[in-house]
Amino acid sequence: IFSKVRYEKISGTDKDIPLITNTKLYSDNAYYANSYGKGGISYYVLQNLLGDDLFFKSLHYYIDTWHGKHPGPYDFFYSINHASGKNLNWFWKKWFFDWTYPDLSINKVEKYRNGTKITIENKGGLPLPVFLEITASGKTTMLRSTAAVWETGKNLMVYNLNLPFDSISKIQLGNEFTPDKFKGDNTWAP
């Protein structure tokens, strides 16, 4: 994921073109960021989504099936779908065909019954895992959700926590591996 920073720079711009696009049509910056940055990050997100065992099982199925042949992108997509037993077409569409970019934000934090309701917004439309670090009463808790939370196409997801609203001192969205174009809306404090 060494190319995360470079990909973040071009994400959401006219250089952030769908991965399915023939690389001969890329400019130099777009070629590097898409081929290495965005491409590599898509596999990281897929691995996070499937879990290590299923990801590597599916990848080995693809490699074994297509060894010595000339697979195209669709062969990869269908092989992973078949081996994982999951219909990941929603994932392939957003990562490889659509004009999406990485931008998650903390949309709203509010008191909800006896706890706290945290709403995360996917502004860029790219399915990404959600990592939330919550500091409350001097303790830090990490919440994690895979990119599957965006499978239905909705751009909002909600955490309802049994954590008193007034005890929260900080909420931080993201981690060092997940790209985000606009980080200014990734921190919340009362």
Task: Walk through the language-model features, giving the residues of each.
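Short beta-strand edge segments in extracellular beta-sheet folds
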Residues: 188-190
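Extended hydrophobic-aromatic, low-complexity segments
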Residues: 56-57, 71, 104-105, 127-131, ...
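Hydrophobic alpha-helical and helix-loop surface patches within well-folded domains
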Residues: 1-121
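Asparagine-centered polar/low-complexity signal
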Residues: 122, 185-186
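Short acidic/polar inter-strand loop motif in beta-rich domains
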Residues: 139, 174-185
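Beta-strand-rich binding/interaction modules
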Residues: 109-174
